[in-house]
């Protein structure tokens, strides 16, 4: 157990002993009704939180129980998007977009109209926190008279501009993208409504300004495409405004005037842009000739603007960013990325909301945040109760390559696992997609080669991706894994299985739709990597299987306990 966990346990036990003594004294104290107050047993009071944590493998920070309990109470009290503070047209577009991406294959629902969309735990917790109105009591309606009123007005203006920092941490595949985009789009729409109600000319002038209002940064171009496509899809959704907006709001003159404006009818009508792989700086600058509401990109693409010799002040367009999301923050704040990420953040001088979003909270990430924001109270943490727990709908199986007939060959073990999955009768009629993770990119190509040449798999069924694979080629190879499973007869290659061999590069944030099988060819180096790899299946409460192949070198006794950890819902540390 790490020193961090040891300290927590010691503090917990110390506090519990005081509680035991307190209850022991009360145990014999008579109440008015002559009843005895029973003391909780010492075993109950001193039982610490169970954690699956071993030596250097342990890389995850344990959030405070108080933070998790706060989220739990909010989650239990809300079961509908209508109960959350979301701008009405944003809510309508979001629900339709979520339905659009739902996989209806192998379900009893005939259409998306039969599907009731409910917010996930992280969406409830994050939207409630981030969308809380700032406590601003402005005196703008009249001229401040006294010194106290002037001071109050200045404080209100300062609070309106003050940076708020949020962290969102929730299990993989839990709907984190909408957990941060719903509040962001809501605030953009509310600001537009405020400008429109000042005057239509003020609103029109703001829309024509060459600025970026909100920024989402991610570590890879695949993730840029993924988030951009979600936002663009929501922006493209059409609906009758008077049917999706509460009649009470439409009777409010402030909402009615804005929502009935020609550029607000029947959709979001936002300007969503991406600055991704292969895009020149000219694509970005041409897109900012009028206001960009949301830009999705990587820190590297933004920092690359510094190399431009023929563009005057290329970063000036970022001076007005008010909302920024650092998605896959555990990656973007690690040693490989942190310089580029923090350089981008320093340019956002007018940012009001800064959101760090991640599926895990590595210890290193927590230390980095503490250095950036030494006052712990300046960060608002949003964690779900299931954080750092492998979902119970995922079945984990350990395969020992040391036993017969594998005789120490992990590759033979993998080939047999692929054969067994191919013939196990699951996903009948559909192409089975399987992800295989290795630790080193140098092992990807040789493994693909041996699976084809030695074990008789078709070349079109086994593909490999590393950081060296060109973006356009990567996009084509990934396509079958990023959409719902196809019927075998509809697949261009008539494949019954498709296998992707890759590294942790593809384990971060990628929404592999409906993937049922993940194989860990190599034992992950840390618990952080384990959670991300396992999280490519079992997304959005769907079932999945994870096969961990071990041999003499990696067959440590503790990893064999992983299936039991999942069944008992134990936190991974």
Swiss-Prot record:
The Q motif is unique to and characteristic of the DEAD box family of RNA helicases and controls ATP binding and hydrolysis. The keyword Transport does not apply. It is an enzyme of class 3 (hydrolase). The lineage of its organism: Eukaryota, Fungi, Dikarya, Ascomycota, Saccharomycotina. ATP-binding RNA helicase involved in mitochondrial RNA metabolism. Required for maintenance of mitochondrial DNA. Its EC number is 3.6.4.13. This is ATP-dependent RNA helicase MRH4, mitochondrial. Keywords: ATP-binding, Helicase, Hydrolase, Mitochondrion, Nucleotide-binding, RNA-binding, Transit peptide.
